[in-house]
């Protein structure tokens, strides 16, 4: 009987694990904060315009900070904001300032990678023009690291994401999307900006891309919002961190609409969805009942 219970327990938990999905927040080119399930990007459940930014400022990227699980946004004028995931209200917390001169730093480029390094709790900002910054979001103090580089060529980095993004972190790696070579790259060492090719995405993407990695149970899953050349909207894809291969999940679009949204960046909520937790609770309750009956 104990063996039977163990098998049932494994089956229930396996079902919960396989059905688990992630809550994804996206930043559109119209400064909308959208929300959808990683398994069904065609069913965007929420779309609110971001408000509370400085006049004429727009957001260039977003990410969840592992140390407090809050969503942060980087403004085009170099301001750092926290974002309310329910109503998209932006609250300014800092401005990017050079750690040596204490002068404001201008962002260079049209597309940016924005992601928290979970080990030192610093925000990495990369750009398609090679900018490479480390930001203390509590103070705005920023280190201008080495320009992004790759041998004799210039990479075109449009999305960045760290692995093992739980707090406190001990080890991590920084992966990037390069829209010029259509490659997944590893930035190693990160502060030097050196790009090492991991492998081809297998798709021809534009510079409009968002990238994020979520870590649960010590497992890293990578996702991206990518715009294919010749298309207007964005598609949601899984990224294989071992090979670089992108696998399309679907268009990112509102429910009951065939029009895809143009998405600049994505950030995956590190906290499991309530539905997933309810499913897990139901599974454990079922196991408990079976044990009592036995």
Model-based region annotation:
Residues 2-19:
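Gram-negative bacterial Sec-dependent N-terminal signal peptides
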Residues 21-60, 65-68, 242-248, 253-254, ...:
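N-terminal segment immediately downstream of the Sec signal-peptide cleavage site
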Residues 23-27, 70-73, 122-125, 169, ...:
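Conserved beta-propeller blade signature
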Residues 32-35, 79-82, 131-135, 181-188, ...:
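Structural motif
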Residues 38-41, 84-87, 137-140, 189-191, ...:
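Short loop/turn segments that connect beta-strands within beta-propeller blades
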Residues 44-54, 91-99, 142-151, 188-204, ...:
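Beta-propeller fold detector
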Residues 272-289:
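A short, hydrophobic C-terminal helix/tail in secreted or cell-surface proteins
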């Amino acid at each position: 009987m104990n063996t039977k219970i163990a098998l049932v327990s494994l089956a229930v938990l396996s079902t919960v694990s396989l059905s688990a999905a992630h809550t994804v927040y996206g930043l559109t080119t119209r400064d909308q904060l959208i929300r959808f399930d990683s398994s069904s990007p065609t069913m965007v459940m929420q779309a609110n315009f971001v408000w509370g930014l400085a006049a004429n400022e727009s957001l260039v990227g977003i990410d969840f900070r592992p140390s407090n699980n809050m969503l942060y946004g980087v403004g085009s004028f170099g301001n750092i904001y926290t974002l309310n995931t329910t109503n998209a209200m932006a609250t300014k917390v800092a401005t990017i300032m050079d750690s040596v001169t204490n002068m404001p730093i201008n962002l260079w480029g049209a597309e940016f990678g924005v992601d928290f390094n979970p080990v030192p709790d610093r925000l990495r900002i990369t750009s398609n023009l090679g900018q490479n910054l480390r930001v203390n979001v509590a103070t705005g103090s920023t280190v201008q690291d080495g320009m992004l580089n790759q041998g004799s060529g210039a990479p075109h980095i449009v999305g960045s994401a760290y692995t093992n993004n739980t707090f406190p972190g001990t080890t991590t790696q920084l992966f990037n999307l390069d829209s010029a070579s259509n490659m997944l790259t590893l930035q190693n060492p990160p502060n030097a900006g050196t790009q090492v090719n991991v492998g081809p995405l297998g798709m021809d993407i534009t510079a409009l891309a968002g990238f994020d990695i979520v870590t649960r149970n010590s497992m890293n899953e990578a996702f991206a919002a990518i715009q294919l050349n010749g298309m207007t909207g964005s598609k949601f894809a899984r990224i294989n961190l071992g090979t670089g291969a992108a696998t399309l999940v679907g268009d990112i679009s509102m429910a009951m609409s065939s029009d895809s949204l143009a998405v600049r960046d994505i950030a995956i909520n590190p906290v499991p969805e309530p539905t997933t937790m309810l499913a897990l609770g139901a599974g454990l309750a079922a196991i408990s009942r079976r044990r009592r009956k036995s």
